[in-house]
Amino acid sequence: MDFRIATSQDTPQVEALWAYCFEPKEDPFFQYYFSNCYEPENTLVGIQEGQLLSTVHLRQYNINVRGAILPTSYMVGVATHPAARRGGVGGALLLHSLEELRRRGQGITILMPSKAGFYQQYGWDLYAHQWVQTMPLESLRPLTDKTLSFGLLNDVEQWTLLDPVYKAYTKDLCGYAERGEKEWKRLLGSFFAEGVNIAVVKNDEGQIEGYAVYRLGAPEIPVTEFVYTTRRAQRGLLNYFYNHRSQGESIRWNEGLHDTGYRFVPDGKTGHTTMPYMMARIVDVETALTTVPVNLEAVMMPITLNIKVTDTLCDWNHGVFALSLGESTLPNVKRVSAESVDEIDITIDIGGLTVLLMGAVSAKDLVFEGKLQGESHWIDYLDMVYPKQNTYINEWW
């Protein structure tokens, strides 16, 4: 199978494969996506005997990792026609995608997995989970607050009302998507095209403290984005949904894993689960290590450590890299060997290095998981240089 970037002539076949594997052409999201958001220049296709049998859409995002804004491709619509499955096409598609992203100078890529195990074998690991709360609407009453007023949004130009709330919510988090006017309008446009609602809660000064994105029409009300700057804002939104008891039976909402409000829920024995949400993978080790900042307070003097990285998919990442710290928040990195050197301080697999940089897992925990090996003083040092973060992202496509 030959892989290349799509052209406009490929669009009918790209649409057909999406409709075969995901939403049908009549679906509102399909129509919105291919009318407003599809970019052939950011889509990789696999062609065999003139037939387009495999695709991945490389959605362009900027994600915030440890305070640095990194251009990133969010892989969505990873699809292979059943006629071409179980022949290694999926792995080849991912490899060619990584080669393309490396050519573009990107260091990290992300994707939302339908099955994490498929991608883990190729070096992806989960960096963001979410809480999923499900409960009968009647059970919301003890969690409500009546001090805030409600409002509804109905125009993409109202993105400016949501942006300050999102910025405040993500201020101390890691791995989230930066949203500007373009991203907000694209997002709100997709919501309104699909008949999705956006509710806000406001204080007496008219300042919006929180918002929720939700859909009606089924016994369970799904809330796919739940963002708030205060606990009373969350409770105010739950009060809003409590008023929907005649329009639904239960509610299900997602929230960041950093939120510890579950500790104060009167009855949390049921309906409280975690959802594996987003995976990440290093595209290029040198680029990733030189663009993700370190904790400068932990770097007291110049120091170099040799890190052996194992990557069974991308040979350019497999080898020993000299990581030099001490001059700034961004290290210097040089690949010193494709195989091994006499002195190796740390050995880590590509997935482990990814979640370490993303802040999802500490070096000590990676040792426990068997993804990192090294002397204890180097493990402690890594945890000072790359301290664990509260990770979050809520981009569905």
Regions inferred by a protein language model and the residue ranges of each:
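Hydrophobic adenine-recognition pocket in adenosine-nucleotide-binding enzymes
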Residues: 6, 78-80, 226
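Conserved acetyl-CoA pyrophosphate-binding loop and the N-cap/start of the following alpha-helix
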Residues: 84-96, 232-236
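Conserved active-site alpha-helix within GNAT-family acetyltransferase domains
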Residues: 103-107, 113-131, 236, 258-274
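Short hydrophobic/aromatic beta-strand element in the GNAT-like acyltransferase core
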Residues: 41-45, 55, 77, 195-200, ...
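Short amphipathic alpha-helix that is part of the acyltransferase structural core
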Residues: 1-60, 67-74, 141-183, 217-221
